[in-house]
UniProtKB/Swiss-Prot annotation:
Subcellular location per the Swiss-Prot or TrEMBL entry: Nucleus; Chromosome, Telomere
Motif Nuclear localization signal, residue range(s) on this chain: 313-329
Quaternary structure, from the entry: Homodimer. Component of the shelterin complex (telosome). Interacts with terf2; the interaction is direct.
GO CC terms of this entry: chromosome, telomeric region; cytoplasm; nucleoplasm; nucleus; shelterin complex
Organism this protein belongs to: Gallus gallus
SUPFAM superfamilies: Homeodomain-like (SSF46689)
Protein name: Telomeric repeat-binding factor 2-interacting protein 1
Keyword Cell inner membrane in record: no
Gene name as annotated: TERF2IP
Pfam families reported for this sequence: Myb_Rap1 (PF08914), Rap1_C (PF11626)
Misc. comment: Shares a bidirectional promoter with KARS.
UniProt keyword annotations, A-Z: Activator, Chromosome, Nucleus, Telomere, Transcription, Transcription regulation
Family: Belongs to the RAP1 family.
Protein's GO biological process: negative regulation of DNA recombination at telomere; positive regulation of canonical NF-kappaB signal transduction; positive regulation of NF-kappaB transcription factor activity; protection from non-homologous end joining at telomere; regulation of DNA-templated transcription; regulation of double-strand break repair via homologous recombination; telomere maintenance via telomere lengthening
Length: 329
């Protein structure tokens, strides 16, 4: 598919269109097209932003099909949104008690959200559920979501946690981290270690290579101490290696690069999927801050307020907080 022109996704007055799409493979596929076409991406739903949903996915009233992006790219112009706008889902039958039932997709979304926010306030409290209600995770109130999780879904969550392996063998992510931290890794022409299973004969990403790499496709909330609701799709301990393989394979194919380059790009961007995608596309971060280096990480480890203040000035407070969490993961 041809890359879109720079001004496809802009309004008549020249301002960029803003889009929101739930984290996942669709976002990975469409984000480079939207960004290259001049659009902006929202990490959470914002007033006035175009909410994109995949065909067949439950959609709120007014949401726009992801086919819109593809159609604009193919036609090389901005098309009317109304041609791709959903009128809203048909109402579901209520339960005998008069409540709207939870769907399997909503149950899965609740479980995933709790897994991704393992460091957030307790599930028995209210803060987590009010946050999820604000993000529009499901059609239900925060009270209904909390009740659904505590009464029906928590046993499934505990069972899933018990079946996770305590430790994973070293994979490509750890190998890239070792390369990233090496004092000799400043050159992009350094030899790839012989033991790294970079690609199989088909040129694809072997699943075994992702055994040490796990990723969360949903946005992970920043620590409550930050006092902000901004989110970022970062790599987390609760996700599966299959998702990591899909993401890395997608980047390798999208940007025609090798496995080590992709994993090092993820390291430099604190595991942020959207930031890594833009970095591989444009050679810089979308937010304008520099990428992290080994020297920056060494400075970050120092218990020195002056050093920390310099890092915040260089990377921004949010990026420093994400880097600290990423290095601990």
């Amino acid at each position: 598919m041809a890359a879109p022109p720079r001004k496809v996704f802009v309004w008549e007055d020249g301002t960029p269109m803003r889009f929101y799409i739930r984290p996942g493979m669709a976002k990975l596929r469409l984000a480079p097209l939207l960004l290259a076409g001049g659009a902006g991406l929202c990490r959470v739903q914002e007033p006035g932003a175009v909410h994109l949903v995949q065909p067949g996915e439950p959609a709120p009233d007014g949401a726009v099909s992801t086919d819109y992006v593809v159609a604009c790219v193919e036609s090389q112009r901005r098309l009317p949104l109304d041609l791709y706008r959903h009128s809203g889902p048909a109402p579901l039958a209520a339960s005998p008690r008069g409540r709207l039932p939870f769907t399997e997709a909503e149950d899965a979304a609740l479980l995933r959200a709790v897994r991704e926010r393992s460091g957030a306030p307790r599930v028995s409290g209210t803060a987590l559920w009010k946050e999820l209600e604000c993000t529009g995770l499901t059609r239900h109130s925060w009270q209904a979501m909390r009740d659904r999780y505590l009464r029906h879904l928590r046993p499934l969550h505990r069972e899933s946690q018990q079946t996770e392996e305590a430790a994973a063998p070293m994979g490509i992510f750890e190998a890239a981290n070792r390369e990233f931290e090496s004092s000799e890794s400043g050159s992009d022409t350094s030899d790839t270690p012989d033991e790294l299973p970079l690609q199989n004969g088909e040129g694809t990403f072997p699943l075994e290579a992702a055994s040490g790499l796990q990723t969360g496709l949903d946005d992970c909330a920043l620590p409550a101490a930050q006092g902000e609701n901004k989110q970022t799709n970062t790599f987390s301990d609760s996700s599966k290696a299959e998702e990591a393989a899909q993401i890395i394979q997608h980047f390798m194919e999208e940007f025609h690069t090798d496995l080590l380059t992709v994993t090092q790009a993820l390291l430099k961007n604190s595991g942020e999927v959207e930031a890594t995608s833009y970095y591989l596309h444009a050679g810089q971060r979308l937010d304008g801050y520099p990428v992290w280096s080994r020297e920056d990480d060494l400075e970050l480890q120092k218990d020195d307020e002056d050093v920390r203040s310099k890092l915040i000035a260089k990377f921004g407070a949010e990026n420093v907080a994400r880097r600290v969490a990423f290095r601990k993961s």
